[in-house]
Amino acid sequence: MLRALPAASLTALGGCGMLTSSAPRFEYFIIEDVRGAPVTAPVARLDRTLLLTGGTTQALYDSDRIVFTRDGAGRAYYQFSNWSERPARRILALAETRLSDSGRFRAVAQTVAGVRGDLVLSLRLDELIHDDATTPGTVRVAVTCDLIDWRSRKLLARRSFEQSAPTPTRDSRGAARAASVAVGALLDELTAWVVTSATGAA
């Protein structure tokens, strides 16, 4: 589900302070977790606490602004459309919920919670872009993850993930819908990998 949070946009007309119907409306979009089919088979829980932390995101994507490209080479921001929060932070929160809901760990939290953990998942956002160079356009999302044994400081596994989804419309609203689908598919893949890697290291 896509949610847009419109912000009031006030335009003074001739100094009288009247609102006009042609005034641009600023919108904020929320990246949702569009989940795949739920796993119904019983699963064994690992007696380990998993902590999540964000990696360093490059400056272009370390923003609440929505990035797009028209030619596949240049990059720009939408003028009147933003994410409700920075995508790196939002995706990390969605990954936390996903992994907690998997029921495979004793507990799942972010490192900022101050919880003592056994494993740490570092998640870095590499790309989140609306590519409108072809029709239909697509949204690509890519992340790199490191799974670390926090007690021994040993790198257990590293993997990059990338997913894309077509945009239903050639605008920021369509980009937001596609981003939610792509992020959901990426979290499907990421969750399975984390569980498998953590189980193998147990």
Q: Which stretches of residues belong to each language-model region?
A:
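Solvent-exposed coil/turn segments that connect beta secondary-structure elements
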Residues: 55-57, 71-73, 126-128, 144-150, ...
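Short secondary-structure boundary motifs at beta->alpha junctions and helix caps
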Residues: 73-82, 151-189
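Surface-exposed short loop/turn segments
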Residues: 20-30, 34-39, 102-152
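Extracytoplasmic/secreted envelope proteins and their assembly/folding machinery
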Residues: 88, 92, 96, 180-183, ...
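Sec-exported extracytoplasmic/periplasmic mature domains
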Residues: 96, 100-104, 191-195, 199
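A structural "domain/chain start" motif
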Residues: 17-87, 197-202
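N-terminal export signals
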Residues: 2-18
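Soluble periplasmic/extracytoplasmic beta-strand elements of cell-envelope proteins
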Residues: 49-54, 67, 120-125, 140-146, ...
